[in-house]
């Protein structure tokens, strides 16, 4: 795992956006794995700026999102489809039919999960997967205890995750209790992974991810099993890392 520590959230967002732009410039048919939540918002903002400034063409690219809430339609304002359209898809020329988000309000979740896995396979797999990290170490909605061989499935959200996401809803009672999420094995199947973490609240999760042995109790630690992971954190998110980990840090700007 390559660790890159940057000054702040703004620099983190720029570096992550630059990585995605580089992928698309090198391979116009790049398959992007995308994340939602608070952390990637700045990255998407920077990605739009870079794409417009450099006339980046996404017409041959495609994307797969990590997850979607169970029970929300794609047009619900808090659905992850709506999030992606607002924060990215409506601002670049990626074809709508090539942007994939799990369907959360289907009547057959098993079939939807199988369909999603097959769609990823038919696309040739994900070239670069963007991740955030939860305070409890979750990636996607793979909560602690998620097995390393898990595929896309319906997951039960923990109370801490529901409470963390309540800020996007009018009340905690409105937050869905389940989600369709790519599994750990699905995520590890990406050719490259870039994980972003910002703020002191993520510092302990970052420490556990990087310093503990891979364990299902800290889903993000299972990324140690992947051959090409870049972890970009700001100084606050890196504040609990030990000297031995920091000794191997890739300097910002290199």
Swiss-Prot record:
Tell me where the transmembrane regions lie: none
Q: Name one GO cellular component term.
A: cytoplasm
Q: Which family does it belong to?
A: Belongs to the glucosamine/galactosamine-6-phosphate isomerase family. NagB subfamily.
List the catalysed reactions: alpha-D-glucosamine 6-phosphate + H2O = beta-D-fructose 6-phosphate + NH4(+)
Q: Which HAMAP family match?
A: GlcN6P_deamin
Q: Name one Pfam family in it.
A: Glucosamine_iso
Q: Among its keywords, does the record have Magnesium?
A: no
Q: Which NCBIfam families match?
A: nagB (TIGR00502)
Indicate what this protein is called per its UniProt record.
Answer: Glucosamine-6-phosphate deaminase
One term of GO molecular function: glucosamine-6-phosphate deaminase activity
* Keyword Oxidoreductase in record: no
InterPro entries noted in UniProt: Glc/Gal-6P_isomerase, Glucosamine6P_isomerase, Glucosamine6P_isomerase_CS, NagB/RpiA_transferase-like
Q: Which GO terms describe its biological process?
A: carbohydrate metabolic process; glucosamine catabolic process; N-acetylglucosamine catabolic process; N-acetylneuraminate catabolic process
- Catalytic-site annotation from UniProt: 67 (proton acceptor), 136 (for ring-opening step), 138 (proton acceptor), 143 (for ring-opening step)
Name the keywords, alphabetized: Carbohydrate metabolism, Hydrolase
Pathway(s) annotated for this protein in UniProt: Amino-sugar metabolism; N-acetylneuraminate degradation; D-fructose 6-phosphate from N-acetylneuraminate: step 5/5
Tell me, what does this protein do in biology?
A: Catalyzes the reversible isomerization-deamination of glucosamine 6-phosphate (GlcN6P) to form fructose 6-phosphate (Fru6P) and ammonium ion.
EC top class named in words: hydrolase
Q: What is its EC number?
A: 3.5.99.6
